[in-house]
Amino acid sequence: MKAIVFAYHDIGCAGLKALTDAGYDIQAVFTHTDDPGENNFFSSVARVGAELELPVYAPEDVNHPLWIERIREMQPDIIFSFYYRNMLSEELLSLAPKGGFNLHGSLLPHYRGRAPVNWALVNGETETGATLHKMVKRPDAGDIVGQHKVAIAANDTALTLHKKVLEAAQALLKEQLPKLKNGTASFTRQNEAEASYFGRRTAADGEILWHKSAQEINNLVRAVTEPYPGAFSYLGQRKLIVWRARVLDTRHDKQPGTVLSTSPLIIACGEGALEIVAGQNDVGLYVQGSRLAQEMGIVTDVRLAAKPNAVMKRRTRVLILGVNGFIGNHLTERLLRDDRYDIYGLDIGSDAISRFLGNPRFHFVEGDISIHSEWIEYHIKKCDVILPLVAIATPIEYTRNPLRVFELDFEENLKIVRDCVKYNKRIIFPSTSEVYGMCDDKEFDEDHSRLIVGPINKQRWIYSVSKQLLDRVIWAYGAKEGLKFTLFRPFNWMGPRLDNLDAARIGSSRAITQLILNLVEGSPIKLMDGGAQKRCFTDINDGIEALFRIIENRDGLCDGQIVNIGNPTNEASIRELAEMLLESFNNHPLRDRFPPFAGFKDVESSSYYGKGYQDVEHRTPSIKNARRLLDWQPTIAMQQTVADTLDYFLRTTVQEGDGA
């Protein structure tokens, strides 16, 4: 059986040898050139390939059409990936009739993604292993061929655990490769409910947070000790690296990071204490903890902590256009909870942000983006991060006022994009789940899903294509002129202050606000085409936390990226949303202040939205980018979001009525 192999690291070497032993005909080996900035403690795939007299390549992009064509000419039957660091495209995988198979260093579906051995130690796991699975579009998500478990000992480090996983991988391959070859392998689908995903780790992730427990800190030390860069902290401006540590059940009343003893060197933690058994300063030698204390002049009661800034860092200035809107006012609230940000905002109203007007870090001007262009350009020049949140985003307006949608959503926002290019400012642009249109993928993927819209006479798509065109323009400015950007795509965010009931009265609101208006006024709940359309509803607090992390942009991971922000587990039809809302309404303490429920009424969408409307049956996001780039996962159940949103509107309605 002819095989193409993508491999790196010790496990890549083990994979090559196992395939050779199993009688596979290896046509070519693809690997990576070694990074001179990395401690290459592992064996060389290139060297093993040469010893086996195999052709070895190390292209920068194996998914490039030229390489795909070369691999096609090799006519592989099967493809293997053993710790190869890049994703293989669907087109490449399709070249092998038997498919592609990857060896992963965890017990999938747990610890998908990068550095699974290190992450397992960081999180204090007691078991991991090796998994051989089929490769699919989503990383580490294909059917499992086989697994071998490995026990994690209390004294295991990343290196010792890696060696255990390597032995498990060798045994697993010896067991399963013959079965794949003769067609007797069995496959088990992964349980998505148990899946977890972890992103890449960098040296900066080794910083010790002393408010954590001694056990958690020791787990970090074990995960990043030699041959990795090590866990570290600071004594003033001087860096201290911890190579080995011991957890102590010591009670104390000191602040975390305080030195309790210098011989042995013991540090107070949020819970318990940590003895530094061995370490070094950043220009010294590997020494015992007590010797390290002597070398660095560490004395009892001093505190280890993060490296202090030499000068006070200026707050990041964030410009929010459309600050009074649903996303804008919730984002302002989140930013003001963090002292690192000053917010500058513009909008045509201030009812939703009135609670912030007395805050010295919030600067607001009432105005229209189509008129106040000079003010906007000045503040783009002045600020660091720009969020143009002004848009018409209610479905009925797409058919009722298509030209106004285009003028505001595209033309006015294009001016802002160009000012960001002009002044070299970072823009975080609100794309939309609408850009996916009638995409037929099960999950909408930022990097691979097709963007499919309807015919020209269906004017509802003018919003989608206006946003999509801006996405493409921003992407092009990034590629050609260095614009720093992130595109985020909200999937049906809900919560308090979403639209208002006056907007719902003229049909210019999102679904849940329209449904709440029906309940408040005692009118029938209108379900367009029976309400069978499914959406994934996302709590505003979950969404804003993801957006906040995009603004933070740790290690620049979000630069040039597109990020879906949605909750795939909160999928429901509009009818199910209405039924959930009705149940919450009937159980609300203010229920008796409102009319009786008038029932459900099925309505044709064309009669409500107009002839140019066209709906979509489902819209489910892939959130792999959000998990990978933001370390973000939605947590709030839809029932809670519905209850919170309803409560806000009911209490607001009663207060306004009592005030009148």
Swiss-Prot record:
<protein>
    <recommendedName>
        <fullName>Bifunctional polymyxin resistance protein ArnA</fullName>
        <ecNumber>2.1.2.13</ecNumber>
        <ecNumber>1.1.1.305</ecNumber>
    </recommendedName>
</protein>
<dbReference type="InterPro" id="IPR050177">
    <property type="entry name" value="Lipid_A_modif_metabolic_enz"/>
</dbReference>
<feature type="binding site">
    <location>
        <begin position="368"/>
        <end position="369"/>
    </location>
    <ligand>
        <name>NAD(+)</name>
    </ligand>
</feature>
<comment type="pathway">
    <text>Nucleotide-sugar biosynthesis; UDP-4-deoxy-4-formamido-beta-L-arabinose biosynthesis; UDP-4-deoxy-4-formamido-beta-L-arabinose from UDP-alpha-D-glucuronate: step 1/3.</text>
</comment>
<keyword id="KW-0441">Lipid A biosynthesis</keyword>
<dbReference type="GO" id="GO:0046677">
    <property type="term" value="P:response to antibiotic"/>
</dbReference>
<dbReference type="Pfam" id="PF00551">
    <property type="entry name" value="Formyl_trans_N"/>
</dbReference>
<comment type="similarity">
    <text>In the C-terminal section; belongs to the NAD(P)-dependent epimerase/dehydratase family. UDP-glucuronic acid decarboxylase subfamily.</text>
</comment>
<dbReference type="Pfam" id="PF01370">
    <property type="entry name" value="Epimerase"/>
</dbReference>
<feature type="binding site">
    <location>
        <position position="460"/>
    </location>
    <ligand>
        <name>UDP-alpha-D-glucuronate</name>
    </ligand>
</feature>
<dbReference type="InterPro" id="IPR001509">
    <property type="entry name" value="Epimerase_deHydtase"/>
</dbReference>
<feature type="region of interest" description="Dehydrogenase ArnADH">
    <location>
        <begin position="314"/>
        <end position="660"/>
    </location>
</feature>
<feature type="active site" description="Proton donor; for decarboxylase activity">
    <location>
        <position position="619"/>
    </location>
</feature>
<keyword id="KW-0511">Multifunctional enzyme</keyword>
<feature type="binding site">
    <location>
        <position position="492"/>
    </location>
    <ligand>
        <name>UDP-alpha-D-glucuronate</name>
    </ligand>
</feature>
<feature type="binding site">
    <location>
        <begin position="526"/>
        <end position="535"/>
    </location>
    <ligand>
        <name>UDP-alpha-D-glucuronate</name>
    </ligand>
</feature>
<keyword id="KW-0520">NAD</keyword>
<comment type="function">
    <text>Bifunctional enzyme that catalyzes the oxidative decarboxylation of UDP-glucuronic acid (UDP-GlcUA) to UDP-4-keto-arabinose (UDP-Ara4O) and the addition of a formyl group to UDP-4-amino-4-deoxy-L-arabinose (UDP-L-Ara4N) to form UDP-L-4-formamido-arabinose (UDP-L-Ara4FN). The modified arabinose is attached to lipid A and is required for resistance to polymyxin and cationic antimicrobial peptides.</text>
</comment>
<keyword id="KW-0808">Transferase</keyword>
<comment type="similarity">
    <text>In the N-terminal section; belongs to the Fmt family. UDP-L-Ara4N formyltransferase subfamily.</text>
</comment>
<feature type="binding site">
    <location>
        <begin position="136"/>
        <end position="140"/>
    </location>
    <ligand>
        <name>(6R)-10-formyltetrahydrofolate</name>
    </ligand>
</feature>
<feature type="site" description="Transition state stabilizer">
    <location>
        <position position="102"/>
    </location>
</feature>
<keyword id="KW-0448">Lipopolysaccharide biosynthesis</keyword>
<feature type="region of interest" description="Formyltransferase ArnAFT">
    <location>
        <begin position="1"/>
        <end position="304"/>
    </location>
</feature>
<dbReference type="GO" id="GO:0016831">
    <property type="term" value="F:carboxy-lyase activity"/>
</dbReference>
<feature type="site" description="Raises pKa of active site His">
    <location>
        <position position="140"/>
    </location>
</feature>
<feature type="binding site">
    <location>
        <position position="114"/>
    </location>
    <ligand>
        <name>(6R)-10-formyltetrahydrofolate</name>
    </ligand>
</feature>
<dbReference type="InterPro" id="IPR005793">
    <property type="entry name" value="Formyl_trans_C"/>
</dbReference>
<dbReference type="InterPro" id="IPR036477">
    <property type="entry name" value="Formyl_transf_N_sf"/>
</dbReference>
<feature type="binding site">
    <location>
        <position position="347"/>
    </location>
    <ligand>
        <name>NAD(+)</name>
    </ligand>
</feature>
<keyword id="KW-0046">Antibiotic resistance</keyword>
<dbReference type="GO" id="GO:0016020">
    <property type="term" value="C:membrane"/>
</dbReference>
<keyword id="KW-0560">Oxidoreductase</keyword>
<dbReference type="InterPro" id="IPR021168">
    <property type="entry name" value="Bifun_polymyxin_resist_ArnA"/>
</dbReference>
<dbReference type="InterPro" id="IPR011034">
    <property type="entry name" value="Formyl_transferase-like_C_sf"/>
</dbReference>
<dbReference type="InterPro" id="IPR045869">
    <property type="entry name" value="Arna-like_SDR_e"/>
</dbReference>
<feature type="active site" description="Proton donor; for formyltransferase activity">
    <location>
        <position position="104"/>
    </location>
</feature>
<dbReference type="InterPro" id="IPR036291">
    <property type="entry name" value="NAD(P)-bd_dom_sf"/>
</dbReference>
<feature type="binding site">
    <location>
        <position position="613"/>
    </location>
    <ligand>
        <name>UDP-alpha-D-glucuronate</name>
    </ligand>
</feature>
<comment type="subunit">
    <text>Homohexamer, formed by a dimer of trimers.</text>
</comment>
<dbReference type="GO" id="GO:0009245">
    <property type="term" value="P:lipid A biosynthetic process"/>
</dbReference>
<feature type="binding site">
    <location>
        <begin position="432"/>
        <end position="433"/>
    </location>
    <ligand>
        <name>UDP-alpha-D-glucuronate</name>
    </ligand>
</feature>
